[in-house]
Amino acid sequence: MRAGAVVCYPTDTLWGLGADPSRPEALRRLAEVKGRPEGMPVSVAFSSLEEIEPWALLSAPDRAVLRVHLPGPYTFLLRSSPRARQRWAPGVLGPGGRLGVRVPDHPGARAFLTATGPLTSTSANRHGSPPVRDLPEARRTFGSRVAAYVAASPAPRGVPSTVVDRWANEREPVRRF
């Protein structure tokens, strides 16, 4: 992962594409694999709620909401921390420094994320196409452009995560990612 590679891994919702969020070359490679423009924000998957803490500015209400819903099929848009703005590559954070965070309710995904650290979490699909449904389809779609395919049960449900904007009272537009 530290060499800018992209991996395909299961989550509770869809198959995802992961890359090291701190490496600009990994984000460029991810955009290339998906066939999408560079710079579109991408959420980050974590192994636990505690792992999110250094990367997002969490209020007490944010923590309470996250404790109830994570791990789970949600992506929360939060205010990024100075550490995230300093260490993560352009293209991870959205407008105004928003950070999309996930903790998948999938034991294999969380074990993988424990081993690798936070990874990008974007659906495994070519830009504008539906997400892949299974590992064989992922291999056919991405081939050697993806460095590794992580096989772990159970299979993803096939429904995208629900995006919850914790900045809903802000006037900036929200980009769904």
Label the predicted regions:
Residues M1-F177:
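Active-site-adjacent structural elements in enzyme catalytic cores
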